[in-house]
């Protein structure tokens, strides 16, 4: 075991947002993962509720092989092949899958790392012999969007019980035990693979965001155990050894510059962004700050018009900017432009926005690495890692860095397992290598990168002898992920309306950090072109239910959409909270209008105002009779949306307390009632 821990490099403190993925309604709003919030987590089994995998029938869909695949490893032995499929929403499961792929390459396997949705049923049924699935759980037991396609196939009733009898498998899950269905997704997948005849190699691994130990430590330990089991099941031939961890593996996605071709101009980043193939196009029609000018938190009411025939980015026919500035009721904008929409949105739907690195940051990296002279030649990349929305064209080094490489994120330890090979200074090489080691190296890395929020670009420029071979660019730098936002407009209207908090803060080393997406978005002008993708993830139909909504901060965005769209005589209650009534009462005009129209019962909490009543959970307790009446007597729905951490846990504790005290129940009885709400889908929770 210790040999395998040393052989296969560990990984660093990972973005904890993976554990806070949204609940079964998929109301995504992960505004910025760069700079990344990273916390300690570990393996902790807390859920005892049995898992029942229910199969379903349906029409067969077309399944195609992924366009971008990991190339065959020259170090693999004939017939020694492993497929590692991941499902993720913030990238953590993908990072683990990539690390596991590298580890298996060192065991002389031909390793293929793919999204679950890119693993076709034909390939799974015929070509896969060893399978590992790495999957996070989205909120209350759901599988992420990029894994649902394969999961739906696996649930078909007509599948024979021996479909996967040729497959040896294991799984690894990422979860958060503060959710009632902790690691539910991976447990469902694991059980279903067994039902279809697959046999286990090694045990399933799980990590828990709520544990004091790091998920990286737990993952490393599980990986070592799995690799040990894998070697026992598939021993190496005599005379063939495992590839040492100190040896640099060949590039999986090699890149070279076509200097024999003309240079390409990709300086117009907005135009280049629109060359992605798998996106929708729109025009910015609103980018209004909705918090007070003197307030430290800049929140934007951001609007995108996609009202064009064939979505061809035609010029606007109205002066949306003037309409927005003249209207205190932001819903007026939606009503004014709803006719003729070519793209339809329902309450709960989300959009992905694609950030761009700044010109200054891109130029700095090009200068530091000596790539300026080759930055504008077209790239030759025989294989590309999969990416949502597709790649821009032409793909030059400049456009690749601008639109696709995450150079401003906090580096993970996997980054250092590559780059120490490329430093020419022995002292710098030794230091970089230390960051790639478990134990003290992990602690040093946390102090160096995570605590001060140091970016990849800063690391590269600080180690001046570090020169990354162009061939390894796609292996060394992580890909930028799109950021997901819930719509806030009334269903079936345009423009798309988003509520976005601009990320900007000072670190402990007195450096200003800005979110890549929100810095870019904050500077977009009216009329500017933008690309996005749409995710149809509507919440359940709540018109037949009384609803209590709890929404601090920008969590109010999907609540606004629900309130504007709701056509029901049922009771609608909102507990909204923020810091200051006069500075960040988001959507105040809309909410107060709904109150005046008898469509909403509104309770507010402003934590920094004197005598404001504190936080949303404190106001809920003051209204405990209402809470108990709606949730118990009227069998209503509770819908919680906002930042992760204390808020969702304290809201749940408050709900249990309200029900207990008003009904005269024991704590155990109230807890069982809330668990029943969670199981029946009447307790909806999204945090990030």
Swiss-Prot record:
Q: Does the keyword Flavoprotein apply?
A: yes
User: What's the EC number here?
Assistant: 1.18.1.-
- Residues given in the record as NADP(+) binding sites: 554, 607-608, 613-617
Q: Which residues form the Flavodoxin-like domain?
A: 82-227
Residue limits of the FAD-binding FR-type domain? 277-543
Stretches with biased composition (Basic and acidic residues): 59-68
Q: What's an example Gene Ontology biological process for this entry?
A: iron-sulfur cluster assembly
Write down the HAMAP family for this protein, in alphabetical order.
NDOR1 (MF_03178)
Q: What does this protein do?
A: NADPH-dependent reductase which is a central component of the cytosolic iron-sulfur (Fe-S) protein assembly (CIA) machinery. Transfers electrons from NADPH via its FAD and FMN prosthetic groups to the [2Fe-2S] cluster of DRE2, another key component of the CIA machinery. In turn, this reduced cluster provides electrons for assembly of cytosolic iron-sulfur cluster proteins. Positively controls H(2)O(2)-induced cell death.
Q: Partners and quaternary state?
A: Interacts with DRE2; as part of the cytosolic iron-sulfur (Fe-S) protein assembly (CIA) machinery.
What name does the UniProt record give this protein? NADPH-dependent diflavin oxidoreductase 1
Q: Which gene encodes it?
A: TAH18
């Amino acid at each position: 075991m210790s040999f395998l821990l040393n052989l296969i490099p560990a990984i660093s403190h990972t973005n904890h947002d993976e554990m806070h993925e949204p609940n079964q309604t998929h109301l995504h709003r992960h505004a910025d993962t760069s700079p990344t919030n990273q916390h300690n987590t570990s393996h902790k089994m807390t859920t005892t509720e049995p898992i029942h995998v229910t199969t379903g029938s349906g029409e067969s869909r077309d399944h195609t092989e992924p366009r971008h695949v990991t190339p065959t490893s020259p170090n693999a032995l004939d017939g020694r092949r492993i497929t590692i499929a991941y499902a993720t929403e913030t990238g953590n499961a993908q990072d683990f899958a990539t690390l596991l792929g590298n580890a298996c390459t060192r065991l002389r396997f031909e390793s293929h790392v793919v999204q679950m949705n890119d693993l076709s049923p034909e390939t799974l049924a015929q070509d896969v012999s060893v399978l590992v699935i790495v999957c996070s759980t989205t909120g209350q037991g759901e599988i992420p969007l990029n894994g649902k396609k394969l999961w739906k196939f696996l649930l078909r009733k007509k599948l024979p019980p021996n479909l996967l009898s040729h497959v040896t498998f294991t799984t690894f899950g990422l979860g958060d035990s503060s959710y009632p269905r902790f690691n539910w997704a991976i447990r469902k997948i694991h059980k279903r693979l067994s039902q279809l005849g697959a046999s286990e190699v090694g045990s399933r691994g799980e990590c828990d965001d709520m544990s004091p130990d790091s998920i990286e430590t737990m993952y490393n330990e599980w990986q070592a155990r799995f690799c040990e089991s894998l070697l026992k099941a598939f021993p190496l031939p005599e005379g063939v050894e495992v590839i040492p961890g100190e040896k640099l593996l060949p590039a999986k996605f090699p890149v070279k510059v076509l200097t024999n071709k003309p240079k390409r101009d990709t300086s117009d980043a907005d135009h280049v962004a629109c060359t992605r193939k798998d996106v929708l196009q729109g025009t910015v029609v609103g980018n209004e700050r909705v918090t007070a000018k003197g307030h430290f938190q800049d929140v934007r009411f951001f609007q995108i018009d996609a009202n064009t025939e064939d979505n061809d980015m035609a010029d606007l026919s109205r002066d949306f900017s003037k309409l927005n500035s003249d209207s205190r009721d932001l819903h007026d904008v939606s009503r004014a432009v709803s006719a003729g929409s070519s793209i339809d949105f329902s309450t709960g739907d989300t959009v992905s926005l694609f950030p761009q690195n700044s010109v200054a940051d891109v130029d700095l990296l090009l200068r530091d690495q000596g790539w300026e002279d080759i930055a504008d030649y077209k790239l030759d990349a025989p294989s590309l890692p999969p990416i949502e929305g597709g790649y821009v064209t032409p793909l030059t080094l400049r456009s690749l860095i601008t639109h696709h490489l995450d150079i401003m994120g906090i580096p993970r330890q996997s980054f250092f397992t590559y780059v120490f090979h490329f430093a020419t200074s022995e002292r710098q090489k030794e230091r970089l290598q230390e960051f790639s080691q478990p134990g003290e190296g992990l602690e040093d890395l946390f102090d160096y990168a995570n605590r001060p929020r140091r970016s990849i670009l800063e690391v590269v420029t600080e180690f001046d002898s570090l020169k990354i071979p162009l061939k390894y660019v796609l292996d060394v730098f992580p890909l930028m992920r799109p950021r997901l936002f819930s719509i806030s407009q009334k269903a079936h209207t345009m423009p798309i309306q988003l509520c976005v908090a601009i990320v900007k803060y000072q670190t402990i080393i007195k450096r200003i950090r800005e979110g890549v997406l929100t810095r870019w978005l904050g500077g977009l002008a009216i009329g500017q072109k933008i690309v996005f993708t749409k995710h149809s993830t509507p919440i359940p139909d709540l018109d037949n239910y009384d609803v209590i909504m709890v929404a601090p901060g920008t969590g109010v965005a999907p609540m606004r959409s629900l309130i504007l769209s709701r056509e029901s005589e049922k009771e609608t209650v909102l507990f909204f909270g923020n810091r200051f009534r006069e500075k960040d009462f988001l959507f105040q005009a809309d909410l107060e209008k709904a109150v005046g129209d008898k469509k909403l019962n509104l309770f507010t909490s402003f934590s920094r105002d004197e005598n404001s009543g504190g936080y949303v959970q404190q106001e809920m307790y003051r209204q405990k009779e209402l809470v108990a009446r709606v949730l118990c007597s009227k069998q209503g729905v509770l819908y919680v949306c906002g930042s992760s951490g204390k808020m969702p846990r304290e809201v749940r504790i408050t709900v249990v307390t309200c029900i207990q005290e008003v009904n005269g129940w024991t704590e155990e009885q109230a807890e069982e009632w809330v668990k029943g709400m969670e199981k029946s889908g009447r307790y909806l929770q999204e945090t990030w």
